């Protein structure tokens, strides 16, 4: 959850900043949005640009956001085991050794991020290391390594780029129509202000609606990461890890969405979750 939400929030922020900059350029220079084809090209440049900038920033931002400490030289047996386990799994999965970090949190959390399969990050919480058995923790690590091996951050970026493109295109197309109707009654300055306000408002609204698509895709990829972990360490270890997370959720019924997809609510809430419900993931693994 942490990996996906950080990417989506950063992506939205970058796209909005780029959008504001473009609107200021329009206002200062008097340029108009132009033809539909020109608008689509601009939307694609900004949409994919925002997504890929977010991806390139993801590793450093993720570390800073949790106050993670990179393990360069293991200081104890736990850190030694952690590095050794990730190294072994990375070799099995055919990827470069990820940067490994630990961050202080009582929650059972872990995430992976990074722009490249050979330049990635795997971070685990102290809560995970303290509350899981070695077999369970090994399965969680295998799940994160599988995300990297599957190239999930890159495919999510491409998906987000497409979504961004349509969000920007539709927002500005509608804003242009509204501003054009307004220009018959008001001055040019008012026309640009209307265009600016409507385009930003619609980007926020359409961006929220588009998150249903990106969250669906994220849930889809979680099943693949679970299957990848099952291939690396065996499905029983992966099931045990999910069962442990389920027990943790049941002991803390506060509705918190953890990094491994724990949430007590279903229905509409599930559509906005980056991870499928644990019961569905466990059932899928039992049939694997």
Swiss-Prot record:
GO biological process, one term: proteolysis
Organism listed in the record: Vibrio vulnificus (strain YJ016)
GO-annotated molecular function: metalloendopeptidase activity; zinc ion binding
Cellular compartments annotated: Cell inner membrane
The protein's enzyme class: hydrolase
Protein family according to the UniProt entry: Belongs to the peptidase M48B family.
Entry annotated with the keyword Glycosyltransferase: no
Keywords in alphabetical order: Cell inner membrane, Cell membrane, Hydrolase, Membrane, Metal-binding, Metalloprotease, Protease, Transmembrane, Transmembrane helix, Zinc
Cofactor note (record): Binds 1 zinc ion per subunit.
Cofactor: Zn(2+)
Record EC number: 3.4.24.-
Membrane-traversing stretches: 4-24, 36-56, 151-171, 193-213
Membrane topology according to the record: Multi-pass membrane protein
Official protein name in the record: Protease HtpX
């Amino acid at each position: 959850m942490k990996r996906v939400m950080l990417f989506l929030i950063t992506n939205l922020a970058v796209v909005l900043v780029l959008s504001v900059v473009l609107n200021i350029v329009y206002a200062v220079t008097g340029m108009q949005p132009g033809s539909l084809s020109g608008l689509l090209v601009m939307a694609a440049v900004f949409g994919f640009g925002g997504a890929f900038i977010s991806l390139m920033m993801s590793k450093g931002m993720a570390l800073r956001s949790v106050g993670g400490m990179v393990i360069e030289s293991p200081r104890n047996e736990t850190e030694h085991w952690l590095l050794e386990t990730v190294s072994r799994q990375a070799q099995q999965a055919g990827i470069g050794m990820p940067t490994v970090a630990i961050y202080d949190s009582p929650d059972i959390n872990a995430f992976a991020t990074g722009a490249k399969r050979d330049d990635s990050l795997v971070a685990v919480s102290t809560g995970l290391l303290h509350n899981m058995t070695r077999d369970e923790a090994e399965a969680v690590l295998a799940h994160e390594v599988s995300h990297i091996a599957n190239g999930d951050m890159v495919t999510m970026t491409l998906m987000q780029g497409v979504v961004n493109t349509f969000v920007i295109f539709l927002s500005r197309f509608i804003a242009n129509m509204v501003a054009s109707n307004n220009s018959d009654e008001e001055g040019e300055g008012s026309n640009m202000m209307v265009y600016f306000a409507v385009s930003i408002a619609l980007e926020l609204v359409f961006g929220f609606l588009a998150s249903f698509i990106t969250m669906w895709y994220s849930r889809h990829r979680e099943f693949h990461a679970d299957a990848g972990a099952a291939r690396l360490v065996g499905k029983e270890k992966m099931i045990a890890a999910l069962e442990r997370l389920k027990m943790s959720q049941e002991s803390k019924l506060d509705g918190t969405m953890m990094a491994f997809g724990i949430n007590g609510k279903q229905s509409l809430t599930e559509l906005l979750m980056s991870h499928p419900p644990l019961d569905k993931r466990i059932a899928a693994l039992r049939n694997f």
